[in-house]
């Protein structure tokens, strides 16, 4: 049984890696692999089949907590984006210097990814860069810095990256421990590329027509943008605090934060027509959430837990410790 499950896991991961050539979405592959492995495990299990069902239900409870957490956090980010909340920061970027823009964009991305999540932050900042300047070597370098900064910033936060979130929710690490141990290494991971890029970009100049991000990105000033942005950031920051004080799973804090942000939005749009209110509602924000990513992680976690049940992961851990 162990050999069959290991073979299925390897085949599944290879299919995910070669998603583009085989033209099969990685979400479908992960769900199929995770589900199939549990079916094989149940069919070949020597004991009572009800024990397998109980184990699956127990593990899926943990998985559900993570999925609800991700769904809530991603919905908060979408609500902020719908209200043009991120323009509160980006519209204050005013510089004609490429070097200054490099450091400003890198710094904003680094800290924003720690408060939100690295993927959403990278998408937001790269979208802004595309509006700020035409395709060029300068934009490519800045986009590269955005990706590095987003990953570095998300690494030292319990809610900034899916990996740290998994470890935090699973109880392997604490929120304070992640920040304490990983902040300086994460900071170095962005400072070194910024310094290297600064030397490479000496002599680069901005196009004359592009004086500031605020002038290029003429965001409509929306009533409540600042309030929704601050409510979202405050709510997400409070998630680790609520967990440490109450001991409750993080998804409780995220759900409370989502309700808080939604309430702020409702207050600002309460006197508008119903069709306008719907454009700023939680339901509309949910429709913009990347649900396929959530399902992808569900499949991966199902696979991980079944491998854990047959001791493959523990044996691999012992092997790596003895080898290295």
Predicted regions mapped to residue ranges:
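Interfacial loop-to-helix junctions that mark the boundaries of transmembrane helices
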Residues: 1, 21-27, 51-64, 175-184, ...
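C-terminal ends of transmembrane helices
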Residues: 13-23, 75-91, 130-133, 196-200, ...
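Alpha-helical transmembrane segments and, especially, the helix-loop junctions at the ends
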Residues: 113-123, 140-171, 193-194, 198
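Structural signature of hydrophobic alpha-helical transmembrane segments
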Residues: 1-8, 61-72, 113-122, 151, ...
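Hydrophobic mid-bilayer segments of alpha-helices in multi-pass membrane transport proteins
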Residues: 3-13, 23-46, 63-75, 225-235, ...
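Membrane-embedded alpha-helical segments and adjacent helix-loop junctions characteristic
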Residues: 50-138, 292-324
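Juxtamembrane and boundary regions of transmembrane helices in multi-pass small-molecule transporters
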Residues: 4-6, 136, 140, 156-157, ...
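Transmembrane helical segments that form the transport core of multi-pass membrane transport proteins
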Residues: 83, 92, 105, 235, ...
């Amino acid at each position: 049984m162990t050999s069959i499950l290991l073979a299925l896991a390897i085949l599944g991961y290879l299919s995910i890696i070669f998603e583009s050539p085989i033209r099969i979405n990685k979400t479908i592959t992960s769900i199929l692999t995770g589900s199939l492995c549990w079916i094989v495990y149940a069919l070949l299990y020597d004991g009572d089949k009800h024990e397998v069902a109980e184990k699956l239900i127990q593990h899926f409870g943990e998985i559900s907590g993570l999925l609800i957490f991700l769904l809530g956090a991603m919905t908060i980010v979408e609500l902020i984006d719908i209200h043009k909340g991120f323009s509160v920061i980006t519209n204050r970027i005013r510089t004609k210097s490429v070097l200054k823009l490099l450091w400003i964009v890198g710094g904003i991305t680094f800290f924003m990814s720690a408060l939100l999540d690295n993927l959403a932050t990278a998408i937001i900042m790269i979208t802004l860069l595309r509006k700020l300047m035409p395709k060029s070597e300068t934009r490519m370098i800045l986009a590269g810095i955005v990706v590095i900064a987003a990953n570095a910033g998300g690494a030292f936060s319990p809610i900034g990256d899916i990996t740290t979130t998994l470890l935090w929710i699973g109880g392997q690490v604490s929120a304070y421990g992640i920040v304490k141990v990983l902040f300086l290494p994460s900071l170095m991971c962005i400072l070194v590329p910024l310094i290297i890029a600064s030397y490479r970009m000496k002599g680069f100049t901005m196009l004359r027509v592009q004086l500031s991000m605020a002038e290029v990105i003429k965001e409509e000033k929306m009533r409540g943008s600042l309030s929704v942005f601050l409510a979202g950031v405050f709510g997400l920051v409070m998630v680790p605090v609520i967990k440490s004080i109450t001991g409750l799973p993080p998804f409780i804090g995220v759900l409370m934060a989502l309700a808080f942000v939604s309430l702020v939005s409702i207050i600002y749009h309460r006197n508008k027509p119903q069709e306008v209110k719907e454009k700023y509602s939680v339901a509309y924000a949910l429709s913009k959430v990347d649900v396929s990513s959530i399902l992808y992680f569900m499949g991966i976690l199902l696979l991980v837990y079944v491998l854990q049940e047959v001791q493959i992961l523990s044996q691999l851990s012992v092997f790596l410790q003895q080898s290295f």
